[in-house]
Amino acid sequence: MKGKFITLEGIEGSGKSTSLEDIANTLDKKSIDYILTKEPGSGSLGNELRSLLLSSDNKISGEVELLLMMADRKNHLDSLVIPNLNNGIWVISDRYLDSTYAYQGGGRKMDVALIDELSSSLNLLAPDLTILFDLPVEIALDRAKRRASLDRFEKEPIDFHNRIRDIYKARAE
């Protein structure tokens, strides 16, 4: 049996990471084999890219950010997601392709056609289910600020986060 690929999407502080625990508990009760993962940042390459992408010390252009995200995603799919799905294991990912449309397309105002082209060229897998966590930006950012330190994305101005939320909502319709 092929596993299921479920992605969790939403702005910073929307509750994705917290909800992973609830999903894991439900799958445990149903005796379903699963792994929890995240983007960016699964595996050694992913962890390195995550550090580069989230560090406030790095000034990265939107184009470079997009290419690094897509490189991480392709590696994540090939090395972790697809092998587990083929072994019947469910994969629950904190972020996936919708985050690129939201953050780079909406937040960074990049051409969505470029994201479409990269996605198609890389033959990216479509999730079986995507769950969007939506709440007002002000509330989500307030929740994110309660963490130990803010990353490069969390420090962006509120209009950046409003554009991200708008794209998420549009993609969910």
Listing of model-derived features with the role each one plays in the protein:
Residues 13-14:
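ATP-binding Walker
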Residues 99-166:
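A glycine- and Lys/Arg-enriched "phosphate-lid" helix/loop adjacent to the NTP-binding pocket
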Residues 17:
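Walker A/P-loop
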Residues 6-8:
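Hydrophobic anchor at the beta1->P-loop junction of P-loop NTPases
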Residues 1-3:
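Phosphate-binding P-loop
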Residues 26, 30-123:
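ATP-dependent small-molecule kinase phosphotransfer cores
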Residues 171:
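Post-transcriptional modification and biogenesis factors for structured RNAs
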